[in-house]
Amino acid sequence: VDLRFLNGHFNFMGVPADEYPRLAQSTEERVEFTVPADMVKKGLDNTCFAVSVDTVRPIMTGIYWDIHEEDITFVSSDTHKLVRYVNRAKAPGLDAHFVMPSKVANIIRSLITSEDVDIRISFDSKSGLFEFGEYFISCLFIHGNYPDYRRVIPENNPFNLEVDRETLMGALRRVNLFSS
């Protein structure tokens, strides 16, 4: 593509669409459901920061989607912090799980806009397809056994703490000066 304008021009290189590899057709039966786009965005926004960058344990470099009849739980951990985001707003009514690579999660969360209403998700044991707006994003999942995050979080915790947000933020800023 040659783009010409008043003070010069730019030449962009491109590749014809038919030279890109086609999506592999799986022989497995694919699970398919639709969820609100804002639910996926909130789940990814709340978990992406805690994903591990250590490739020694590749399963920890992704976001674990734990899908149940009554909710979808997004989980990530870098082994120092564990984040669990549970959304019960519109459960798909099935039981499944997969680990989405963090790069794909960051791409999807950056592409979701307020105009996107729903995301259609279809997947098998190896890969997933996420369709919303004018985007079709295909990815291979990270394979392995994600650690049981439920064992780390106490079921019946008798302690409950409510703190003023501004007070807590101020204290964290002061302590941050002395942390490494």
What residue spans do the PLM features occupy?
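Structural preference for solvent-exposed beta-strand-turn elements
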Residues: V1-S180
